[in-house]
A protein has these predicted regions:
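Alpha/beta-hydrolase fold catalytic core
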Residues: 1-44, 68-71, 232
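Active-site loop/oxyanion-hole signature of alpha/beta-hydrolase fold enzymes
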Residues: 27, 34-36, 40, 68, ...
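Conserved HGGG/HGGXW glycine-rich cap/lid loop of the alpha/beta-hydrolase fold
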Residues: 29, 35-83
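Gly/Ala-rich beta-loop-alpha elbow adjacent to hydrolase catalytic centers
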Residues: 117-121, 125
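Flexible "cap/lid" loop of the alpha/beta hydrolase fold
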Residues: 130-131, 138-170
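Conserved alpha/beta-hydrolase catalytic His-Asp/Glu region
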Residues: 150-152, 170-241
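Acidic catalytic loop of the alpha/beta-hydrolase fold
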Residues: 226-227, 251-256
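Short beta-strand/loop motif that positions the catalytic acidic residue
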Residues: 241, 247-249, 253
Length: 256
């Protein structure tokens, strides 16, 4: 089965950029991003940072509200997700932070930026703000990751399993191939918002990103190399800095 599924997955170099976005050619490959421009700009820019596996399309319903309020918006896919490249690297905290910094520099953004991160995007923007406070106007969290295990021993067991080479290799290849042509496990039902992300759109992007080798590899590497389970210290350090911040927890949020 392993050999069969290895052949089935497509080479990431064959990823085709959709018309609604752009590629930024960075050090580790292409980062796919969407740019939303306000008709009444305040001269401020927001970077939207998505979570562990669902790519930047999840921001579709949020971006119009931000642009109507005067903000220019950038939403991008992490490496390994969506339409971005799938580099064979360790997906560490530093890797995500440096990618965001490189994208900001690539887009020639000189002013301080507003950061919004949901789920895993929370620790990314939090660590970025801690390390680059002079670059950040505000940092905002939507259901941020970081409190997944109550005891460190639980996360240690999880990481030991993922560090078994055979398991890592098997999951990285077989899982996306089995799901190839399937749908996102997230089911949407809310339909009050005309700007909402439809179930069909979410499923289409999920199917597309799972066609290519490297999607699940990026997830496994992130779980192994980016401490998403205990980020309390990061949040505590951020709280001591003079950076505007907010946290949102939604009891009816169907994505996070």
């Amino acid at each position: 089965p392993y050999i069969y599924y290895s052949i089935k997955l497509k080479n990431p170099s064959r990823i085709i950029k959709p018309e609604y976005g752009k590629f930024a050619e960075l050090t580790n490959g292409n980062i796919f991003y969407q740019e939303f421009t306000s008709n009444n700009p305040l001269g401020q820019i927001v970077f939207l940072v998505h979570g562990f596996s669902t790519p930047s399309i999840v921001w579709k319903g949020i971006a119009p509200y931000l642009t109507s309020a005067g903000y220019d918006v950038i939403a991008y896919d992490h490496y390994g997700r969506g339409f971005s490249s799938r580099p064979k690297v360790d997906y560490t905290k530093g890797f995500y932070i440096s990618t965001l910094m490189e994208l900001i520099d690539h887009l020639k953004v000189k002013q301080k930026v507003h950061l919004i991160g949901y789920s895993m995007g929370g620790p990314i923007v939090g660590h970025f703000a801690n390390e680059n406070p002079n670059k950040v106007e505000s940092v905002n969290f939507i259901a941020p990751a970081g409190y997944m295990f109550k005891r460190k021993s639980q996360s240690n067991v999880y990481l030991k399993i993922l560090n078994i080479p055979f398991i890592t290799k098997y999951i990285s290849v077989v899982f996306p191939s089995l799901m190839y042509g399937g749908s996102s496990s997230i089911k949407l039902s809310t339909d009050e918002d005309e700007n909402r992300l439809s179930q069909n759109e979410l499923n289409t992007v999920y199917r597309e990103q799972m066609k290519y080798e490297g999607f699940t590899r990026s997830l496994v590497s992130t779980a192994k190399n980016f401490n998403l389970f205990n980020t309390q210290k990061m949040f505590q350090e951020l709280g001591k800095k003079n950076i505007n911040s907010s946290v949102i927890w939604g009891d009816a949020d169907e994505i996070v």
